[in-house]
């Protein structure tokens, strides 16, 4: 099966597993997916993740996080798509829900959150919004 947008597939898998309250999910791994999972962990949206080495590309196992009666991730949206890339300059980096959510950006300094990009004064491609 050929994937046309592996990042969107990962975000959709997380969104679907979150809706049915699965404890964990597995997606094919890549460097950018690991960096996105690291940001989600650091910002408190997922409990943890681990990279499982196989003889192909590897597997990323993501452990989801839930509150007592609610989901931690309420919204997950892919912004820049293969058919329509969305780039922003340093002074145009968006705030998601006035700071309640995060924007994940791919920059020349790596994959960063919107706060980190503003602090470093760098723009880039908006990968996704997480609320």
Swiss-Prot record:
Pfam families (alphabetical): Ribosomal_S8 (PF00410)
For the keyword Oxidoreductase, the answer is: no
Keywords annotated in UniProt: Ribonucleoprotein, Ribosomal protein, RNA-binding, rRNA-binding
Secretion signal: which residues? none
Q: Which GO terms describe its cellular component?
A: ribonucleoprotein complex; ribosome
Q: Does the keyword S-adenosyl-L-methionine apply?
A: no
| Highest taxon listed in the record's lineage | Bacteria
Question: What does the UniProt record say this protein does?
Answer: One of the primary rRNA binding proteins, it binds directly to 16S rRNA central domain where it helps coordinate assembly of the platform of the 30S subunit.
Similarity annotation: Belongs to the universal ribosomal protein uS8 family.
Kindly provide the name given to this protein in its UniProt entry: Small ribosomal subunit protein uS8
Q: Which organism is it from?
A: Geobacillus stearothermophilus
């Amino acid at each position: 099966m050929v994937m046309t947008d592996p990042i969107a597939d990962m975000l959709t898998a997380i969104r679907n597993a979150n809706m049915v309250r699965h404890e964990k999910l597995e997606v094919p791994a890549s460097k950018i997916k690991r960096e996105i999972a690291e940001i989600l962990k650091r910002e408190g949206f997922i409990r943890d993740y681990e990279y499982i080495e196989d003889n192909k590309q590897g597997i990323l196992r993501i452990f989801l996080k839930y509150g007592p009666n609610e989901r931690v991730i309420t919204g997950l949206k892919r912004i820049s798509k293969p058919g329509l890339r969305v780039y922003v300059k340093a002074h145009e980096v968006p705030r998601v829900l006035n700071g309640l959510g995060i924007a994940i950006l791919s920059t020349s300094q790596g994959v960063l959150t919107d706060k980190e990009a503003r602090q470093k004064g760098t723009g880039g491609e908006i990968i996704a919004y997480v609320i």
